[in-house]
Regions:
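Catalytic P-loop NTPase motifs of RecA-like helicase/translocase cores
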Residues: 39, 63, 99, 127-128, ...
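Canonical P-loop GTPase G-domain recognition
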Residues: 6, 115-116, 125-189
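Signal for well-folded cores of large energy- and translation-related assemblies
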Residues: 25, 29, 44, 48, ...
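Conserved glycine(s) of the Walker
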Residues: 16, 158, 250
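A structural signal for isolated positions on well-ordered beta-strands in alpha/beta enzyme cores
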Residues: 55, 118, 271-273
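Conserved G1/Walker A P-loop phosphate-binding module
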Residues: 1-83, 88, 93, 226, ...
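P-loop NTP-binding site
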Residues: 187-282
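Conserved C-terminal guanine-recognition region of P-loop GTPase G domains, centered on the G4
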Residues: 47-53, 73-148, 218-222
Length: 282
């Protein structure tokens, strides 16, 4: 009998959610960048482990739990939708930036949905192991926290244990996704994200995180190479010279970085072409 378990990865920006989901799935499906709230929508990763399908919701930063008119409403809706869908909430903590007060506030808000919460400490490779237990002791009596685990998503420490633990919470059900699916997003979405990630990698201080990349061509050639054309949509004309860079050097670096990432995901030679779209720019 097949089984299913749905989890939502929740945590502060840069706690390591995207790194973890990419590690579990085995492909770079979720954008990784140090720019705040780079996860634009709730991407789903799928891991089939034995007869169990693990469905993982990668959510925007936990800041969107709070009520604020300044936050993007769509991101807030995406976060709460993922929480509603999940069977277990995985609250991920960057153990290097452990903040008791913030954790208590977040858990209190998450407890409103009355679902089991697993506290997952990440980046344990960067601290002394003896520092972990005292932090668990501080939090062990908080309502709805049912378990504690520690990992390093980047160094692949504790990932197998995490997968086994999540699998133990699965229940009998038909699989929601096909055996060969690793995400609810298609190749076009993921390749667009590669380019958006590259833009933020080189220009995170100059360009807004919600910059959009649109696909205009996705075509396999006779030799099985993949030709991709993408349009970078700018809402302000002042971003154009920034992205182009001196003598076009910046956009060249963006293209090369994105092309390399796409090739590593799709395993084909990639011919990537980028253009800047300013028709709706101010």
């Amino acid at each position: 009998m097949n089984k299913v378990i749905k989890i939502a990865l929740i945590g502060k920006t840069n706690s390591g959610k995207s790194t973890l989901i990419n590690n579990i799935v085995g492909e770079k499906i979720s954008i990784i960048n140090k720019k705040i709230n780079t996860t634009q929508e709730s991407l789903i990763g799928i891991k089939n482990y034995k007869n169990i399908q693990i469905i993982i919701y990668d959510t925007p930063g936990i800041n969107f739990l709070k009520v604020s008119k300044t936050f993007n409403k769509n991101l807030k809706v995406n976060l709460w939708s993922s929480i509603d869908e999940a069977d277990i909430l995985i609250y991920m903590i960057d153990i290097i930036r452990f903040n008791y007060k913030n954790i208590i506030q977040d858990i209190k808000k998450l407890s409103e949905v009355n679902k089991p919460i697993l506290l997952l400490f990440n980046k344990i490779d960067l601290i002394d192991k003896n520092e972990i237990l005292p932090k668990i002791d501080l939090l062990k009596d908080i309502k709805n926290i049912t378990s504690f685990l520690s990992i390093s998503a980047k160094k692949n420490i504790g990932i197998k244990k995490f997968i086994k633990f999540i699998s133990s919470k699965s229940y009998n059900s038909k699989w929601i996704y096909q055996n060969n699916e690793i995400s609810n997003k298609d190749d076009i979405y993921i390749t667009n994200e590669c380019t958006r990630n590259a833009i933020l990698k080189f220009l995170h201080k100059e360009i807004p995180y919600n910059i959009k990349v649109k696909n205009t061509l996705f075509k396999y050639l006779k030799n099985n190479d993949l030709k991709i054309k993408q349009s970078i949509e700018l809402d302000n004309k002042r971003y154009k010279p920034i992205i182009l860079g001196k003598n076009g050097n910046t956009i060249k670096r963006i293209r090369e970085c994105s092309q390399k990432d796409i090739k590593s995901i799709i395993n084909n030679n990639i011919h990537l072409y980028l253009q800047l779209d300013t028709k709706n720019a101010k």
